[in-house]
Amino acid sequence: MNIAPPLAITTDADLGPLNTFGLPARAARLLRVRGEEDVRALLAEPGWRGEPRLVLGGGSNLVLRGDFAGTVLKVEIAGRRLVGVREDADGAAWIVEAGAGECWHDFVRWTLAQGWPGLENLSLIPGTVGAAPIQNIGAYGVELTERFDALDAIDLDSGETRSFDRTTCAFGYRDSVFKRAAGRWLVLRVRFRLPQAWAPVGRYADVAAELAARGIAAPGAADISDAVIAIRRRKLPDPAKIGNAGSFFKNPVVDAAAWARLAAAHPEAPHYPQRDGSIKLAAGWLIEQAGWKGRNLGPVGCYERQALVLVNRGGACGEDVARLAAAIQADVEARFGIRLEPEPVFV
């Protein structure tokens, strides 16, 4: 396929540095998308329509099982701005927009520096702004959906640019319409609603303990952000040093009957009642009870400080990760009758 300048296109591109697991893989073509015009130029190419495509953000939610025989679109769209202040039934809020290629953590810290709290519990989550709604991230008592306003995305099939609100994003637990239609949509920019009537969310046990240890009884948003950063750095490996994709499995959500069966044998199991009557379980606890915490299988392993994180001990490939994930799933299911679902996308 002939692509004319100014597109930043690379052939036989190395994807190793572009995924936080550090898995070896190459792409037939890599396009660095720095604006909507780059996507439109690519869509105008006659050979584009029929080939495989992969939209890539920070590569922190990805397991590459081998080379990719198509075009990888590496989203690097920058920009941050205050759109304005909106008054609605929920009160006044700052509407803040960021380009999809912005580093998520840097964006969070920037909003706090501007005096716009609301995203502090989501500090230090790896990845980009554009990937955050795709994965529907959440941590330490706050879900992205609580702060999400809208996003703009381009349909790679039709070339149409469309805006999505909470309803049309069809958010689910660590899920969205974009994740279910992988390769179709490229997120361009995301807008967030940050309430001016801010209140801290510090009820999560780890956050409360960290704040107490710091002697902070009335935390501000920056205090919560600092606490979350400290917790994550203690518990989770730095991808720059140890390859990983963060939390590898979703916390399973079961019905009351399934929880009753588990509680009869393991009343100590961590559990979190949901509004709809279901029960969210701690995948890390299930994995640890199955004996996997700190164990290795070939060049990959289960992190010794957090069983929910799978790590590349050095020289691993995507199939090694898939093999370990399957072994953990099988053991947890055999012991508890619960099937764990991976968070990362396998390609």
Swiss-Prot record:
Its cofactor is FAD. It catalyses: UDP-N-acetyl-alpha-D-muramate + NADP(+) = UDP-N-acetyl-3-O-(1-carboxyvinyl)-alpha-D-glucosamine + NADPH + H(+). GO terms for molecular function: FAD binding; UDP-N-acetylmuramate dehydrogenase activity. InterPro entries: FAD-bd_PCMH, FAD-bd_PCMH-like_sf, FAD-bd_PCMH_sub1, FAD-bd_PCMH_sub2, MurB, MurB_C, MurB_C_sf, Oxid_FAD_bind_N. GO terms for cellular component: cytosol. It is an enzyme of class 1 (oxidoreductase). It is found in: Cytoplasm. The keyword Flavoprotein applies. Cell wall formation. The keyword Hydrolase does not apply. Its EC number is 1.3.1.98. The active site is at R174, S247, E343. Pathway: Cell wall biogenesis; peptidoglycan biosynthesis. Keywords: Cell cycle, Cell division, Cell shape, Cell wall biogenesis/degradation, Cytoplasm, FAD, Flavoprotein, NADP, Oxidoreductase, Peptidoglycan synthesis. It comes from Azoarcus sp. (strain BH72). HAMAP family: MurB. Residues 23-197 form the FAD-binding PCMH-type domain. Belongs to the MurB family. GO terms for biological process: cell division; cell wall organization; peptidoglycan biosynthetic process; regulation of cell shape. This is UDP-N-acetylenolpyruvoylglucosamine reductase. The gene is murB. It comes from the Bacteria.
